[in-house]
UniProtKB/Swiss-Prot annotation:
It catalyses: ATP + H2O = ADP + phosphate + H(+). Its EC number is 3.6.4.13. PROSITE patterns: DEAD_ATP_HELICASE, HELICASE_ATP_BIND_1, HELICASE_CTER, Q_MOTIF. Keywords: ATP-binding, Cytoplasm, Helicase, Hydrolase, mRNA processing, mRNA transport, Nucleotide-binding, RNA-binding, Translation regulation, Transport. Residues 461-471, 479-516 have a biased composition (Low complexity). Residues 1-14 have a biased composition (Polar residues). It holds the Pfam family DEAD. SMART domains: DEXDc, HELICc. Belongs to the DEAD box helicase family. DDX6/DHH1 subfamily. This is ATP-dependent RNA helicase DHH1. It comes from Debaryomyces hansenii (strain ATCC 36239 / CBS 767 / BCRC 21394 / JCM 1990 / NBRC 0083 / IGC 2968) (Yeast). Its main location: cytoplasm. ATP-dependent RNA helicase involved in mRNA turnover, and more specifically in mRNA decapping by activating the decapping enzyme DCP1. Is involved in G1/S DNA-damage checkpoint recovery, probably through the regulation of the translational status of a subset of mRNAs. May also have a role in translation and mRNA nuclear export. A motif (Q motif) lies at residues 30-58.
Length: 516
């Protein structure tokens, strides 16, 4: 293989032709070959489908290779992971059997994803990457560390445990990386991070990446980073390329609204967020009863089950994933083009990370928020903090806002009637999934009756139905929030205060149960 034809032997995947937003396309025109990278590393980069560096990669990779500490702020889904993985792989030496880079992340799923990126980009380098997280066998991790490990990816608690037992030797580790630094320096992890740093040499290089930088990050920077190179590619926190809508929906109407969205939207893959683990499992079951294959994941599940869900969802074996905020941090599944907040989040930070699961790497995405009347205060607060606008949901959502023109390039998950033979089970719960054709039932509160051909179509509702309350002014809130007082939930809700009546379904007065 000569210098001229070394690219010809690479197994380069098909080019992704989906449109991208300017925060990914607005680069300085550099290529990965402009950086002082090993040929073997470049081979892994190109075979992973990388074409040219994103803005955050253009800014961070040269400075990291120069040995500078880095504090980088960029929006979700713009290539932050490769921004620190590439310098780690470039600086690691395969013949030195010591840990040469530690990458800390807040969740187990993100650790698995990051380790996979390390292995993919570094597959020609002869480096060994190990992932270690809580919920897995400590004994197995200890045995694995008897073999050479060059890059260690893990969650803080397990890494501290291994370092304290003197199994993971960090005394000569030159590179310390924190992804999702805002979460890592919260009260939950900050003390652990400080203890881990005590095992490092004083001359280490530190790389911090995040979408938001609270005061805790600045305090950590002042204490532990040496003249850091600061990168800020977020003049505002608005997630470009993601269209955001809301609908005021009574609790018992949410499931029908979700069913209507399924019938109206063109979904490659969708993530649906709930605010509690109990609601995650119950919603997953009811989505299955609507006739859709569905996985769910939350923090109380066994680690092996979470791993399997995450892996199979990434592989496109299912269209819908219901989860708690477990998957809001850094998870990169580019086939996800729709995020639905079944429960509206309480904080702007949570909202930002949730909807950032769509529109990855500058591609188009759609975020829909199902809101109760009391959520309107949080809606206004989040809009103000993020400098964004969340619009009322229209009767028809333009597909060009979230669907790629070349759909053949996007993996298409299965629906129930498309599942491979052998998956036709009835409400079979295996700890983490609901798959198969459901039994027909019309007795579930808030759910439309099933028919042989699938869920019933959305129904138009007469806006005149329901109890009307006089308008109530809320000082300090814009006019669109100064609508009517919450309805008396004793019949049909007044449809004027809900966006798009076709997303509502009338309920008999006797049906007072709510989705709990």
């Amino acid at each position: 293989m000569t210098d001229q034809n070394w690219k010809e032997s690479l197994n380069i995947p098909q080019k992704d032709t989906r449109p991208q937003t300017e925060d990914v396309l607005n680069t300085k025109g550099k290529t990965f070959e402009d950086f002082p990278l090993k040929r073997e590393l470049l081979m892994g980069i190109f075979e992973a489908g990388f074409e040219k560096p994103s803005p955050v990669q253009e800014e961070s990779i040269p400075m990291a290779l120069a040995g500078r500490d880095i504090l980088a702020r960029a929006k979700n889904g713009t290539g932050k992971t490769a921004s620190f993985v590439i310098p780690c792989l470039q600086q690691a030496r395969p013949k030195v059997n010591k840990i040469q880079a530690l990458i800390l992340v807040p969740t187990r799923e993100l650790a698995l994803q990051t380790s996979q990126v390390v292995r993919t980009l570094g597959k020609h380098l002869g480096l060994q990457c190990m992932v270690t997280t809580g919920g897995t066998s400590l004994r197995d991790d200890i045995l694995r560390l008897n073999d050479p490990v060059h890059v260690l990816v893990g969650t803080p608690g397990r890494v501290l445990d291994l370092a304290s037992r003197k199994v993971a030797d960090l005394s000569e580790c030159p590179l310390f990386v924190m992804d999702e630094a805002d979460k890592m320096l919260s009260r939950e992890f900050k003390g652990i991070i400080e203890q881990i740093l005590a095992f490092f040499p004083t001359t280490r290089q530190s790389l911090l990446f995040s979408a938001t930088f609270p005061l805790a990050v600045k305090s950590f920077m002042d204490q532990h980073l040496t003249k850091p190179y600061e990168i800020n590619l977020m003049d505002e926190l608005t997630l470009r390329g993601i269209s955001q809508f809301y609908a005021f929906v009574e609790e018992k109407q949410k499931l029908h609204c979700l069913n209507t969205l399924f019938s109206k939207l063109q979904i490659n893959q969708a993530i649906i967020f709930c605010n509690s683990t109990n609601r995650v499992e119950l919603l997953a079951k009811k989505i299955t009863e609507l006739g859709y294959s569905c996985y769910y994941s939350h923090a109380k599940m066994p680690q092996h089950a979470r791993n399997k869900v995450f892996h199979e969802f990434r592989q496109g074996k299912v269209r819908v994933l219901v989860c708690s905020d477990l998957l809001t941090r850094g998870i990169d599944i580019q086939a996800v083009n729709v995020v639905i907040n079944f429960d509206f989040p309480k904080t702007a930070e949570t909202y930002l990370h949730r909807i950032g699961r769509s529109g990855r790497f500058g591609h188009l995405g759609l975020a829909i928020n199902l809101m109760s009347w009391n959520d309107r205060y949080n809606l206004y607060k989040i809009e103000q903090e993020l400098g964004t606008e969340i619009k009322p949901i229209p009767a028809t959502i333009d597909k060009s806002l979230y669907v790629a023109e070349n759909e053949a390039a996007v993996p298409r998950p299965f629906k129930i009637d498309q599942l491979p033979k052998g998956n036709e089970t009835v409400h079979k719960k295996s700890g983490y999934e609901y798959k198969g054709q459901p039994e027909v039932s019309s007795n579930v509160a808030g759910m439309p009756q099933q028919v042989p051909n699938g869920p019933v179509p959305p129904q138009q509702v007469n806006p005149s139905q329901g109890n009307q309350m006089p308008p109530q002014q809320y000082p300090g809130y814009p006019p669109q929030y100064q609508q009517q007082m919450p309805p008396q939930f004793n019949g049909y809700p007044p449809q004027q205060q809900y966006a798009s009546p076709q997303y509502q379904q009338p309920q008999p007065q006797s049906q007072q149960q709510q989705f709990q």
